[in-house]
Curated annotation (Swiss-Prot):
Membership in a protein family: Belongs to the carotenoid oxygenase family.
Reactions catalysed, as given in the entry: all-trans-beta-carotene + O2 = beta-ionone + all-trans-10'-apo-beta-carotenal; 5-cis-lycopene + O2 = 5-cis-10'-apo-lycopenal + (3E,5E)-6,10-dimethylundeca-3,5,9-trien-2-one; 13-cis-lycopene + O2 = 13-cis-10'-apo-lycopenal + (3E,5E)-6,10-dimethylundeca-3,5,9-trien-2-one; lutein + O2 = (3R,6R)-hydroxy-alpha-ionone + (3R)-3-hydroxy-10'-apo-beta-carotenal
Role summary: Broad specificity mitochondrial dioxygenase that mediates the asymmetric oxidative cleavage of carotenoids. Cleaves carotenes (pure hydrocarbon carotenoids) such as all-trans-beta-carotene and lycopene as well as xanthophylls (oxygenated carotenoids) such as zeaxanthin, lutein and beta-cryptoxanthin at both the 9,10 and the 9',10' carbon-carbon double bond. Through its function in carotenoids metabolism regulates oxidative stress and the production of important signaling molecules.
EC numbers on record: 1.13.11.-, 1.13.11.71
Induction profile: Up-regulated by lycopene.
InterPro entries noted in UniProt: Carotenoid_Oase
Upper classification of the organism: Eukaryota, Metazoa, Chordata, Craniata, Vertebrata
Location of the protein in the cell: Mitochondrion
Cofactors, names only: Fe(2+)
Protein name: Carotenoid-cleaving dioxygenase, mitochondrial
């Protein structure tokens, strides 16, 4: 399977891509509810809100952000009730947003943008300000997350903002580091059926950096609680003390947390000195494929790191699809890229290009494909070297013990060749409530024949077939699966996706698909400009 990697790297080269700059441009918020025009129909049982978040403001005064990830968080709400749909949006009133607004310039640095010294200071004061510790942004623009029944918007710093999902107003700013010894946490936690949340976050100290598994209890003891009771249940030392791996998510089964230490490295020295050197934080991230990728497995119940040393060839993953246990193995499904340099491509100057320049950026980015890895949990000294230790007859993924005791893992492709023509897949979603951590069959994602998603895809990982929804000139967001009441089948429900267009003469809309046959049931059009966003969730009423 891995012999086709070079072929994949060349697959999907495209020319004549349409300009998508309007999708990555500042928009106005829509704080007053707007009624959508429904075409087709929304199921009457579909009652609740699709909440989404992403960047919506890319400059303050004359200062402009450099990277897509830097834009100020814009909260979106599509509310559905009895077949009717309404829309509203508000900018997150973070301290960062308010400070930048008051000064009409970028005061607080973001991932790809270094805030410049106050122009009102004299030369000496501006020079000395380079040696001050930079303020950490609370522009939490990546995802909605849930802890103890409350909703927060999150990024990967130590700050989250609790929001009222009805009004989209910020109600409280919460700092992870006030509760546990971490310097941040991902925006992709996992949840047990009882509501217990798990996450991962880094910590940095005199002895280097650690990756920490975090557990947050499912319920509040007192009414005003936020992250009270959170615990670090396991700390994993990074392979390189001053260059830990960057990660965006992790895997979870019923009993295990799976952390992937990938050769996308964060140079802590560069990050610490970024202000002195006049560089953004993103300058400290580098793809180092001379290192292999390593899988760490942690027992959720005991907090113990399993002794197995699992490795594979270098790859980068941003989003896990699902993971489950079978016959003494962890089966881990991921969206993987063989080239970890894609973060650089998502600078705004690249995304806003047109013509041959835009084609060149797209063709330089590695494609993301779904892959399966199998990690045998109970490897002993007596297990033979050079043989596949995976007992799973349904998967061609292998795990081979080497002379040094390490387990070399080779993946199985989960997709048909048709997916290569769709530009790969990202933003994977499953029927999470019923199939997270369990053997499953379907996932949904965006096809990427452009730098943002340009299709919706349903992929059958058992039969390796796919279904596609596409409308030329329109760009759908991450699909969200909503199960139908009482549905017993895995794909019994609907898919929701916000579909936007750079064409100012066309309306953006919320799309609803039948998850089973992937056919459109309806769309709710709104005459509102929206930028392309990141993630979201559906909350039932």
């Amino acid at each position: 399977m891995e012999g086709t990697d070079q072929k994949k790297a060349a697959v999907g080269t495209r020319e004549g891509l349409p300009c998508i700059a309007p999708l990555l441009t500042t928009v106005e918020e829509t704080p007053q509810v707007v009624s959508a025009q429904v075409r087709g129909h929304f199921p009457k049982w579909l009652s609740g809100s699709l909440l989404r978040i992403g960047p919506g403001k890319f400059e303050f005064g004359k200062d402009k952000y450099n990277h897509w990830f830097d834009g100020m968080a814009l909260l979106h709400q599509f509310k559905m009730e009895k077949g009717m749909v309404t829309y509203r949006s508000k900018f997150l009133q973070s301290d960062t947003y308010k400070t930048n607004s008051v000064h009409d310039r970028i005061v607080i640095s973001e991932f790809g943008t270094l805030a410049l010294p106050d122009p009102c200071k004299n030369v000496f004061e501006r020079f000395m300000s380079k040696f001050e510790l930079p303020a950490i942004t609370d522009n939490t623009s990546v995802n909605y997350v849930r802890y103890k029944g409350d909703y927060y918007v999150s990024t990967e710093t130590n700050f989250m903002n609790k929001v009222d999902i009805e009004t989209l107003e910020k109600t409280e700013k919460v700092d992870w580091s006030k509760f546990i010894a971490v310097n941040g946490a991902t925006a992709h936690p996992h949840y047990d059926p009882d509501g217990t949340a798990y996450n991962m976050g880094n910590s940095y100290g005199l002895h280097g950096s650690c990756y920490n598994v975090i557990r947050v209890p499912p319920e509040k003891v007192d009414l005003g609680e936020t992250l009270h009771g959170a615990q670090v249940i396991c700390s994993i030392a990074s392979t390189e003390r001053m260059k830990p791996s960057y990660y965006h998510s992790f895997g979870m089964t019923r009993n295990y947390i799976i952390f992937i230490e990938q050769p996308l490295k964060m140079n802590l020295w560069k990050m610490i000195t970024s202000r002195i050197r006049g560089m953004a934080f993103s300058d400290g991230i580098s793809w180092e494929p001379q290192y292999n990728t390593r899988f760490h497995v942690v027992d959720k119940n005991t907090g113990q790191l399993l002794p197995g040393m699992y490795y594979s060839k270098p790859f980068v993953t941003f989003h896990q699809i699902n993971a489950f246990e079978d016959q003494g193995c962890v089966v881990l499904d991921l969206c993987c890229q063989d080239d970890g340099r894609s973060l650089e491509a998502y600078r705004l100057q690249n995304l806003r290009k047109a013509g041959a320049g835009l084609d060149q950026v797209y063709n330089s980015v590695g494609r993301s494909f779904p892959r399966r890895f199998v990690l045998p949990l109970h490897v002993s000294l007596n297990d033979p070297e050079g043989e596949n230790l995976s007992p799973l007859s349904y998967s061609s993924a292998s795990a081979v013990k080497q002379a040094n005791g390490k387990i070399w893992c080779s993946y199985e492709n989960l997709h048909p060749e048709d997916l290569e023509e769709e530009g790969g897949v990202e933003f994977p979603q499953i029927n999470y409530g019923q199939f997270s951590g369990k053997k499953y069959r379907f996932f949904y994602g965006c096809g990427f024949r452009h730098l943002v998603g340009d299709s919706l895809i349903k992929l059958d990982v058992v039969n390796k077939t796919l279904m596609i929804w596409r409308e030329d000139g329109f760009y759908p967001s991450e699909p969200v699966f909503v199960p139908a009441p009482g549905a017993s089948e895995e794909d019994g429900g609907v898919i929701l996706s916000v579909v936007i267009t750079p064409d100012q003469n066309e309306n953006n809309f919320l799309l609803v698909l039948d998850a089973k046959n992937f056919e459109e049931l309806g769309r709710a059009e709104v005459p509102v400009r929206m930028p392309y966003g990141f993630h979201g969730t559906f909350v039932t009423v």
